Amino acid sequence: MIVALGADLVEIARVERLLSRHGERALRRLFHEEEVAYALARQNPFPSLAARLAAKEAFQKCWPESLSWKEVWVGMEGKRPALRFAPRIEARMAEEGLFAHLSLSHERSHALAVVVLEARARGGG
């Protein structure tokens, strides 16, 4: 059963400006090491970083309490992006039988993330 839906759209140039202005400090504050490594392996890291920022915001719209930037991040499962969580969020997701589906997309100027939070039977899916 779908419990929540979150979507967010981020302007790629805004992320580029933010990082050019605040550099390494902003990268460390906003993104998990796994996200930074993935993005920096690309010729242009900004669309990937913008999509990951959108994913964090989209998940926050599904979650009932505030989160820090690094409590949720995007990792890869093969070629598919997947949300990863800090231990306290992971534990609560498991306790409540929740699973987060993630879809990312980006075009020339914007990155989009959609998160669907699904309640599953405890133990599977």
From Swiss-Prot:
One GO biological-process annotation of the entry reads: fatty acid biosynthetic process
Q: Where in the cell is it found?
A: Cytoplasm
The record's EC number reads 2.7.8.7
Cofactor needs: Mg(2+)
Give TM regions: none
Query: Which residues does UniProt call coiled coil?
Result: none
Q: Name one GO cellular component term.
A: cytoplasm
Which cysteine residues pair off into disulfide bonds?
none
Task: Spell out the molecular function terms from Gene Ontology.
Answer: holo-[acyl-carrier-protein] synthase activity; magnesium ion binding
Quick one: where is this thing mainly located?
Answer: cytoplasm
Catalytic activity as recorded in UniProt? apo-[ACP] + CoA = holo-[ACP] + adenosine 3',5'-bisphosphate + H(+)
Give UniProt keywords alphabetically.
Cytoplasm, Fatty acid biosynthesis, Fatty acid metabolism, Lipid biosynthesis, Lipid metabolism, Magnesium, Metal-binding, Transferase
Enumerate the residues binding Mg(2+).
Answer: D8, E57
Q: Which family does it belong to?
A: Belongs to the P-Pant transferase superfamily. AcpS family.
Chain's role: Transfers the 4'-phosphopantetheine moiety from coenzyme A to a Ser of acyl-carrier-protein.
Name this protein carries in UniProt: Holo-[acyl-carrier-protein] synthase
Q: Which organism is it from?
A: Thermus thermophilus (strain ATCC 27634 / DSM 579 / HB8)
